[in-house]
Amino acid sequence: MKRVILICYLILNATLLFSQGEKVNIIVFGAHPDDCDIDTGGTAILLAKLGHNVKFVSLTNGDAGHYAMGGGELAKIRIAEAKEAGKRFGVEYTVLDNHDGELMPTLENRLKVIREIRKWNADVVIAPRPNDYHPDHRYTGVLVQDAAYMVIVPNVAPEVPPLQKNPVFLYSEDGFQKPSPFKPDIPVIIDAVFDPKIYAMSAHKSQFFEWLPWTAGNLEKVPKDDKGRLEMLANWRSQAPNEALLKCAEKWYGNKASYAKHIEGFEICEYGKQPTDQEIMMLFPMLIR
């Protein structure tokens, strides 16, 4: 009974907060144009539909991710794809001009990340963990971690006012086990927006229908028609939630979690603000709906 009363109290407080029109600012970092889409696309759509402000930032321009072209020609295509994807997701999409495959955790890049977080006045910052097969993915995680404290330090990047409070920093889900596996704290069921997520992702034609199939040796299997391509992309992303995600989802969604087909999971990073359950519900109001 006490647990029921507590849940009702948290829901009431979160509902009151957002009924007053307060918006949440979420910024998501990825290494390449399309990374944010894969990891947080459904969550972004849900938050945007609730009126919150979401921004995707790619730390490289993606100019190496193709088998038949590269450099400036490819960068232009990938920037245009990201712009179209942003429209479909309902988010702002920024692509920084670092070369694909050459991202390094330099001071210059750290300052770029700090400025992006500050300019967005972020409440939540999402990025990959620094455990990954791709160096650009790893260093994206490192750069965001390195910015976590510095975003509130006035004398660092002083041309952009510091944040008055440290954001919540979250890791997006991955399957890597060493040095430690991903441990979800926040599960977002995206079943209701899975199809719109796939449609938005399909804006990255050079990646999902050319580059990635080529690297997998399946280029000849890519359908020629849009419907077939959407089905192919949906099948690729239709992965049943693992046990850890489902267990985490039960905490927030109750019995509804057992019916979930698609969940985006997030782990709280130790370096930023450590949110309470009530604060998590305020930042991710879809958890109480």
Where are these regions (language model features)?
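Bacterial N-terminal signal peptides
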Residues: 5-16
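Active-site rim/loop-helix segments in enzyme catalytic domains that contact anionic ligands
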Residues: 18-120, 142, 150, 160-161
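Flexible loop residues that form catalytic
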Residues: 62, 130, 174
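Short acidic, glycine/proline-rich loop/turn micro-motifs
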Residues: 66-69, 180-184
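Active-site adenylate/phosphate-handling loop in enzymes that bind or generate adenylated species
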Residues: 116-162
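C-terminal accessory domains and tails appended to enzymatic cores
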Residues: 153-158, 163-165, 179-180, 186-289
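Extended hydrophobic secondary-structure segments that form protein cores and membrane-embedded regions
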Residues: 164-174
